[in-house]
């Protein structure tokens, strides 16, 4: 729901129609996990197995569109940052978990977490005709997911309970992203 909300808000900011809003919300919610499933050769895709996720995102889209129209809600870029940070943490943890369950090495699991966490937002931005925030915003984004992913892997290999690894990954990822936004941390830009 967190990434779907960020997709929905970005689509609303771009003033897309109802179909466009739903498409962008679905891409943001399921794009990274679908790419992960493709790379891990897992079929059917997670959202095909769990159709309640599809219904949940659709319900979120309908409710949000009704709420935003009735309230004349203006979506700012800042409003998108927090649902996006939460989605980044949740999806990173989920991606790492799926890869470890598929018996992938730690480094592959971290990369699958990174892909799951980042690429839904990349697809969201591309469809909205933007350079993906993950690539242009010099405040750490993928780096936060990378650190959170390694936190999960480290706890996994010390036989910590799964919920502890998931929660730690979430806290590290979202916490680092929040610090990066609050303190305006910047990664160096590539100079040609």
Region locations from a protein language model:
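C-terminal ends of transmembrane helices
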Residues: 4-14, 37-38, 63-77, 122-133, ...
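Short, structured motif recognition centered on aromatic/hydrophobic residues
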Residues: 23-27, 34-40, 111, 115, ...
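The first (N-terminal) embedded transmembrane alpha-helix
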Residues: 1-6, 19, 23-27, 147-148
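Ordered, amphipathic secondary-structure segments that act as subunit-interaction surfaces
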Residues: 59-98
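Structural signature of hydrophobic alpha-helical transmembrane segments
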Residues: 1, 45-59, 105-118
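Helix-coil boundary and interhelical linker segments in multi-pass alpha-helical membrane proteins
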Residues: 38-48, 94-108, 153-165
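Small-residue-rich transmembrane alpha-helices that serve as helix-helix interface/gating elements
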Residues: 115, 165-179
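Small-residue-rich segments of transmembrane alpha-helices in multi-pass membrane proteins
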Residues: 24-33, 81-97, 139-153
């Amino acid at each position: 729901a967190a990434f779907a909300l960020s997709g929905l808000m970005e689509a609303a900011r771009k003033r897309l129609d109802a179909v466009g809003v739903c498409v962008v919300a679905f891409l943001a919610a399921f794009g990274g996990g679908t790419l992960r499933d493709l790379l891990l050769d897992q079929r059917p895709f997670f959202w095909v197995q769990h159709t309640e996720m599809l219904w949940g995102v659709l319900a979120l889209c309908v409710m949000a569109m009704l709420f935003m129209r009735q309230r004349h809600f203006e979506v700012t870029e800042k409003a998108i940052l927090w649902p996006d940070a939460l989605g980044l943490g949740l999806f990173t943890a989920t991606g790492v978990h799926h890869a470890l369950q598929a018996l992938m090495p730690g480094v592959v699991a971290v990369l699958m977490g990174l892909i799951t966490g980042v690429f839904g937002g990349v697809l969201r931005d591309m469809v909205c005709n933007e350079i993906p925030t993950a690539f242009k915003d010099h405040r750490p984004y993928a780096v936060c997911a990378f650190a959170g992913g390694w936190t999960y892997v480290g706890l996994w290999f010390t036989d910590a309970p799964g919920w502890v690894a998931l929660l730690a990954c979430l806290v590290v990822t979202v916490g680092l992203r929040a610090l990066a936004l609050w303190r305006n941390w910047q990664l160096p830009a590539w100079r040609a």
